[in-house]
Amino acid sequence: MIHGIGIDIVDIRKIKKIITHSGDKLATRILSKSEWKIYKNKKHPVHFLAKRFAAKEAVSKAFGTGINQGVTFNQIEIFNDKLGKPMLHLFSCTALLANKLSLKKMHITLSDTNSYACAFVILER
């Protein structure tokens, strides 16, 4: 049974502008430690950050809580399996909320163009 669906789209130019004005503040706020290491070594870090931001917003929408209602950016991690498929890993309060809601499966897909990054998430019980 589907618990929630979330989608988000991010203007990559806005993320680039934020990075230009405030450095890595946004990245340190939203990325997990593992994601941070990848971000710092990416050829196109702006696209990476935009996709992670969109993904985490989509997760919060699928939970039905939004950010800061038991779901926080750095407690959601997006990684790729050995075939490159994006996967979700939850930590701390966000993981506890998923357990409380009896979530069994989490699905995510990411996409980007030169201008936009998009994420779509389905959470199942």
Curated annotation (Swiss-Prot):
Name the UniProt record assigns to this protein: Holo-[acyl-carrier-protein] synthase
Annotated Gene3D superfamilies: 4'-phosphopantetheinyl transferase domain
Gene field: acpS
Record's subcellular location: Cytoplasm
Keyword Lipid biosynthesis tagged: yes
Cofactor: Mg(2+)
HAMAP family to which the protein is assigned, alphabetical: AcpS (MF_00101)
Entry annotated with the keyword Repeat: no
Source organism phylogeny: Bacteria, Pseudomonadati, Pseudomonadota, Gammaproteobacteria, Enterobacterales
Species whose genome carries this gene: Blochmanniella pennsylvanica (strain BPEN)
InterPro entries recorded: 4-PPantetheinyl_Trfase_dom, 4-PPantetheinyl_Trfase_dom_sf, ACPS, Ppantetheine-prot_Trfase_dom
